[in-house]
Every structure is written in C-alpha cells, then in structure tokens.
C-alpha cells in the first residue's frame, strides 16, 4: 500500500494468549484510534496483534503489520486473508527479512524494535512478565517515546507484565482519548 509520510502511528502490542477482555480491548482501542486518523502498527501475531489490526480495519483505518519472517511466508497462516485486507485497505505488511526466512523465535524480539521505532507511542494491552511486548515497551522508552499500559486483574497471568509496567511508570490507559 501507499502511506502518507506524516501519518501518526501508534503501536498496539500484547499477548498471543490474551484473555477475552484483552482481545476486546485491543480491537476496540484500535478502532477508536484508527477513527481518529492514527495508523495502528503491530506484529500480526495471534491474540492482541491480530485484534488490533482487525479493529483498525473495522473503522476503515490504516494498519501496518511488521512481520518476523520473509514476506513470502505467512505467519500465522490463519492471518493470510487479514494481511491481504491490510494491504488492500491502504496499509502495509513489511519485513526486514529476505524471502525464504521462516518465523524463527529470535526474529520476534528483533522485529519489535521496528514496531517501537515506527510508532509515536506504544500501548501494551496484556502481557505476561516474560513477554516480547515488554521488549517493545523498553525499546520505545529507549527512543524517548511514551508507553501506555492497560491495567488488568492482579490474578491474571496476562496482566502481570502490564501491571509491572505501570509500577515502573508507564502511563495508565483507561480510555482511547
């Protein structure tokens, strides 16, 4: 797709094994931000990433998938139609990896720096304590960018990372404004 140079982008990241609350929050938040003209950037993975991309598309917004593999591979496979819709709607699926590169585990933390670097701010919806989303948050902070985290249940494994970010000073996200 063709993107405007000065379009503002927000990263929305989180757990692949998200709760129903997190999935709904990611999609709703992405839809509201896309309706305000912001481009949603995420990694295209299952869970929060997928729902963020879908939320942006629901409101006819622009979204960018940053893949951790070559563009001739689709990961996860079930998102092939979603990635086509992203491109057809004026967004993009991008990767720093050459054709033929599989989605290896070491590629995901590396692609997170691109997600953080493309966005004016990063929102972590849900994340465990050992989550790649926390790597994205750290990279965003290293670049001097704001990091928002959605508060979650103290009993939820998928909220331990976001609650940890809040204790460290992340901006609490309680609405899309």
PLM segments and residue spans:
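Glycine-biased, small-residue-rich flexible motifs in mid-sequence functional cores and linkers
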Residues: 1-177
